[in-house]
Curated annotation (Swiss-Prot):
Species of origin: Methanococcus vannielii (strain ATCC 35089 / DSM 1224 / JCM 13029 / OCM 148 / SB)
Positions of the tr-type G domain: 19-260
Source species taxonomy: Archaea, Methanobacteriati, Methanobacteriota, Methanomada group, Methanococci
Modified residues (Diphthamide): 603
CDD domains with a match to the protein in the record: aeEF2_snRNP_like_IV (cd01681), EF2 (cd01885), EF2_II (cd16268), EF2_snRNP_III (cd16261), Elongation_Factor_C (cd01514)
Binding positions (GTP): 28-35, 94-98, 148-151
Protein name in the entry: Elongation factor 2
Keywords: Cytoplasm, Elongation factor, GTP-binding, Nucleotide-binding, Protein biosynthesis
Amino acid sequence: MGRRAKMVEKVKSLMETHDQIRNMGICAHIDHGKTTLSDNLLAGAGMISKDLAGDQLALDFDEEEAARGITIYAANVSMVHEYNGKEYLINLIDTPGHVDFGGDVTRAMRAIDGAVVVCCAVEGVMPQTETVLRQALKEKVKPVLFINKVDRLINELKLTPEELQGRFMKIIAEVNKLIEKMAPEEFKKEWLCDVVTGKVAFGSAYNNWAISVPYMQKSGISFKDIIDYCEQEKQSELADKAPLHEVILDMAIKHLPNPLQAQKYRIPNIWKGDAESEVGKSMAMCDPNGPLAGVVTKIIVDKHAGSISACRLFSGRIKQGDELYLVGSKQKARAQQVAIFMGAERVQVPSISAGNICALTGLREATAGETVCSPSKILEPGFESLTHTSEPVITVAIEAKNTKDLPKLIEILRQIGREDNTVRIEINEETGEHLISGMGELHIEVITNTKIGRDGGIEVDVGEPIIVYRETITGTSPEIEGKSPNKHNKLYMIAEPMEESVYAAYVEGKIHDEDFKKKTNVDAETRLIEAGLEREQAKKVMSIYNGNMIVNMTKGIVQLDEARELIIEGFKEGVKGGPLASERAQGVKIKLIDATFHEDAIHRGPSQIIPAIRFGVRDAVSSAKPILLEPMQKIYINTPQDYMGDAIREINNRRGQIVDMEQEGDMAIIKGSVPVAEMFGFAGAIRGATQGRCLWSVEFSGFERVPNEIQTKVVAQIRDRKGLKSE
């Protein structure tokens, strides 16, 4: 039996012993060394050859990733590691750190119970470190810390042992500050990264060594020895004495939870069903014999096998050939193949049980975030939808160069929409022009060049990038009448800004989009009141949609209940496009004050009620002082002090604001905020301004008001682009 075959046998046997499983991820800021770390862990566990690790980037198995040298999709792999005489199964996920691919990170977090947060010793805690940590803590994923590239502090920055420890303490303190701020209440203390107990490791993933306090005590290696090895260029000897995979995987096994421990507190966070029900108890116990419950965390498209769903099982078991039920798309599907991941390969296994991560083929209609259960015991409700902290802010129009490619292009676009829930796709079969909205320039580029061009073999024309704007209101409208086309139904309403605290709760995901059949359910009502909505209104919310809400303040109108669904539909259509530039509205509250309906139901059908409320909402919004909002990005620039002035000028020239500046040694760290509309071509410009000597990164930071002096111009440009008549 070869090494790989032995490994597969071990993996199969360990899959049934919960306390010996760890589902873990590796996440970090771009280029802080996640994939190099993952590869060396695989090499250490005997999955790829040691000589190739670090250069091989086994988890960057996509050609596009290898060419760019960054991880774009999250890759999965299973391996075995021995700790204190016992073997453990480790399911490892490597996630992208580039801000444009944050959606993949969000999805990976749902599958794992613990994460190794990688932080570069030279750059320290960066914006994306903060974002991935926030996502992890939101999904109740326990973190441990690996400070990477320590050799650079010694060889390039020539730090003394005291300075080294000072630098480490600063990074650990920053990470712990974030954990204290964002961790679930019950774990705020317990999850802090503590050096003494070994929840922090230091090392160099590229040179394949790492160290932690427990390992120092075990092996007798001191910080001084590390400095000597690095200075004398003997890091390969250090790698033999303190191998990276041993230190990191020991830390993971000792400090990260097994599925049985983790599911007790993770399930209530992601599933809002009855904890005392059979399936509720079974998920909390991670019971392989309970009802089936799992969640699809990622869709991978394979040229040969078609669509593969990566799935985390929380309860029950999936065997090859089982009939499954997809809760979101309300469809049945058959598990044609059940496999475990080994990097780019999949190895078939007869069945997979609760607590594991697997690869399923045959779920054609599944999307990322889909709930999987058995048709005989449908999981009600499904798992909470995966919320992602950024939003698509850039749109491009694409058309196929050859008309014969049109049907294939539409199929590929639908497939991309299923794979990646941070992409918004609008397909217009009449004009042949399709819109793709993504998180940033790179995200869009990968979709158009790689997924459509390279994988799909379709040549497309890509239009100029368009920024996604929003509209909101700053005042309260007078009472507005919305009339149906036949003039027999009248609805009276007022538009006013939603309370800031309520909108903030919506952005944080405490309140989400939903329609209420009769009245607000108790859970939503409590959350709305906590967020600051008046109790009287919280009881009467009809619908929350895209961060807008409609409240029924009428009394004793019988026909209103019959028309409820139509009113909600009309409200949604009304806020889809605001009055200024037909961009989506947000933060708008519509209060329904009164209504009169025709007594004959035939005269108050959809074709009458929907337009009445839709036009009413639009009129109310346009008379409530509407304004335009634009997407903003936080920007972090790390540059030598000599170029600080040029870097600041580059931000100021783009309508940006400097939020904070720090100096560390001869480097300056600049934090600012810049409108996305002004960020095109920034990469080249900042490289020129600092002669290529700066590190920079951006992160989406919400929508802000467009300055008054340019609002008219921007609105005119959008209306012109959309072919709306100029106001």
